[in-house]
Amino acid sequence: MTRLTFRTTAAAVTATLAVTMLAACSSGGGGGAAHLTWYINPDNGAQATLAKECSAASNGQYNISTNVLPSDASQQRQQLVTRLAAKDDSIDLMSLDPVFVAEFAEAGFLAPIPDSDAAAFTKDIVAPAVQASTWKGKLVTAPFWANTQLLWYRKSVAQQAGLDMTKPVTWAQIIGAAQTAHKTVGVQAKLYEGYTVWINALVEGAGGQIVDNPGAVAKNLKLGLDSAAGTDAAQVIRSVVHDGVGGPSLSSNDEAGSLTLFEKQDTSAFLVNWPYVWAAMGPGGDKVSFRDSDVGFTTYPQTVAGQPSKPPFGGIEIGIGRYGKNKAAAIEATKCITSAEHQKEYMVSSGNPAANDTVYTDPAVEKAFPNGLAAVILQSLRQAAPRPQSQYYGDLSTALQEKFSPPGSVGSGSPAKAQKFILEVLKGDRLL
């Protein structure tokens, strides 16, 4: 994630309100159909396909066109914030990264979801996706697709180490196995959002949380980093570094870099990464020769032995723009887009996991995510933990990354230093 300051939405866009707004997408449909514009994150065209299918199924009620946002999540946010702060009525629907939901809701950029429609958006949805779509007790976005990280491993290395991968394993166990085998554990520790993802999962997995009172204003915000859970998280990071299993590029590794490391058969052992890994290594991807014979997958490692892990949670939620002129049609379109059938279709065509847990036993999904992978993804989603929900998330995440970087500097005092720094930044006493 680009290092931006997100202290308040108003502050982030003050300098941009004078910029001339881009022209709205051209209307596509007639006959009285409401024209809806859906701002989507880049994919392989699967969201655009859903837009066409739902338009056709609406019987002339609405017609959806799509506008593709930048590939970088922070740039997606910036474009949407700039437009919404200017009360752009061309934004009817938007694909939102879960970490921005609180900020958009707090700023009043999201149209309320009527209580009478909330059940349609939450039925059969995994709990973390509902949590990520909720702000101050109200559903403010509709869960669309959900993501989670798995533990990928070399079967031969795990077997040699005597690890039973049908049971939960700990970070300490996989670090020890990799160290003994002189191989690596792939993580994301670059100074970017992926590092926050790792830190948060470690803290949550130790029974803690980074933000203790979501929704609080900056002066009243309470953090849980300076805690036993924070210390446990720091110890895992320290072990990856000082036990020599992080690899030479640890402090610059993102998802792609850590996957590249894992694909080196002679040096790799374990990797935490998203489900796209399986397809990326297979036909049409990197065509890793040992994928089918020696790559296994299971749920995220435990931070503390015996305490269930809290895998990272990601995905996309659908927000309805406050200033759009066709909110009733937007609600109906969102119901169509996020239906179980369309979530299944999207999961198969894009490779992005569904938020609806009923689709995971569908034959088409099991074919696309074979050998029990679909079931492991669902299990991981059910126990996943979203990143901290806060209207100040951007500043919080950037400050956290700074105080935990480089990974080699992390020690028992890092959580307390990070907590102090984050609070100072949010209260305006320090600058990023």
Model-derived features: positions:
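Glycine-centered hinge/linker elements that transmit conformational signals in sensory
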Residues: 178-179, 218-251, 300
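Extracytoplasmic/periplasmic solute-binding protein
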Residues: 140-144, 149, 172-226
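Long, aromatic- and glycine/proline-rich binding clefts that accommodate carbohydrate-like moieties
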Residues: 298-299, 347-395, 399
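Conserved C-terminal helix/tail region of periplasmic/extracytoplasmic solute-binding proteins
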Residues: 159, 379-432
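Extracytoplasmic/periplasmic substrate-recognition and gating elements
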Residues: 159, 242-245, 284-350
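Conserved N-terminal structural module of periplasmic/extracytoplasmic solute-binding proteins
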Residues: 2-102, 119, 286, 304, ...
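A structural signal for short loop-to-beta-strand junctions that line the ligand-binding cleft
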Residues: 82, 90-92, 121-156, 183, ...
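Hinge/lid segment of periplasmic solute-binding proteins
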Residues: 98-148, 202-205, 296-298, 367-368
